[in-house]
Amino acid sequence: MLLSPLLGLWSFLARAQSETDVKPQTVILVKAGRLLTLPSGKYLEGAGILIEGERIKQVGRAGEVMKLAPKNVRVIDLGNATVLPGLIDCHTHLMLREPEGPNSYALNLVTKSEAFRALEGAADARSTLEAGFTTVRDVENEGSWYADVALRDAINQGLVEGPRMQVATRGIAAVGQYNPFGISPDLRGFPTGAQMVSGVEDVRRAVREQIGYGADLIKLYADWRNPTLTVEEMHVAVEEAHKAGRKVAAHATTPEGIRNAVTAGVDSIEHGHGADRQNLEMMKAKGVYLVPTLSVIDAEFAKDPATREDPQAKKFLENMQQAVRQAKDLGVTIADGSDAARAELHGRNADELVAMTQRGLTPIEAIRAATTNAAELLAWPDRVGSVEAGKYADLIAVEGDPLEDVTVLRNVKFVMKGGKVIRNGFPAN
């Protein structure tokens, strides 16, 4: 009979102790020359953003917001800077630093341990965050099994600093496609860049396995130069993923591959460089996003500009530009994605916004692609993508006007993620 009162007393004392252990949340007021409100694309002049803990509490003119702040508020005055929400990259490969040279992809798989690649990923996650990208969708770790899950969890637990992550883990491709390039068929146990499947039940098992090990989304290869997975195989993947509340991204660059993926019900087309009008009309009708990944192509051609004059290269670039322009004209929702997969490209994620404006998007359209559109694709519009009360305090600031010159986003001077200042290159006021 004595046990029950003692348990009750212990429970009371434990509650009291936990209440005294709770630290008051830090309150910060960020002041700036102006705030870009989204999705409107209009500026709020003389902006103030009140932050409590990791969330935004109030947004308005600085003088009015200051009245709501407690006496011990910490003020961060960014002067005349322009504040935007933290940017979102919907197509990263943080676990991949593919070197130059022949068979480089295969060498990357066989010469680096999963642990080493996870550490590379942590370094590149930090570079991405410092560039102003506070959220990423990492669409396949390219042969490092589930190391991207570990990186995501380490970031969430504060062990390393990086953007919020959604991870696709291994990716799924048809047997005989997307195998390590240049590897002898005798090496049957060699690591592969994606999980290889054949048949609908094989696909179903792969999707369930990846979700079980922590995948936030599923990545399919609808084609690899030519169509690979069948409509039926992709439909099963979509069915299993959607049942588990996960979205499906499809690598697709050919008209047939895109058509098959959209027919199967995927949520986004990654790349889509060869999309024709029929593809884009289908995507618009079904609400499928386009993540065009333009800047990685520009980076490849920048190594040897003369290659642009090759007839095949010219045709490819023309098709890519036409696909983006038609997507915009038809009202297909475009989301930002850099496809950074080399050491020198991680942290240059803003190049994608510049590349989009070079293909016909306006600066505000490119910014929406990396904010509100991207947040919707991630199913996180209540968390990120705009500076509003209740959302995470993910902010960036730049000098100049990104609505006039989107290239200023290549030089982000202030980054805050979840109420924590990651970098501040503005002078103290």
Segments (PLM) and residue ranges:
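His/Asp/Glu-enriched, well-ordered alpha-helical/loop segment
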Residues: 107, 243, 316-402
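Histidine/acidic-residue-rich catalytic or RNA/ligand-binding cores of hydrolases
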Residues: 99-101, 148, 228, 258-264, ...
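Alpha-helix-loop-beta-strand connector modules within alpha/beta enzyme cores
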Residues: 153-171, 228-253, 287, 291-295
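Active-site gating loops and adjacent loop-to-helix segments of metal-dependent hydrolytic enzymes
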Residues: 95-116, 175-192, 285-317
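Bacterial N-terminal signal peptides
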Residues: 1-11
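Metal-associated gating/positioning segment near the N- to mid-region
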Residues: 78-159, 232, 256, 260-264
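Histidine-rich, glycine-flanked metal-binding segment
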Residues: 20-24, 35, 40-84, 107, ...
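Divalent metal-dependent hydrolysis catalytic cores, especially in the metallo-beta-lactamase
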Residues: 120-146, 162-170, 213-226, 247, ...
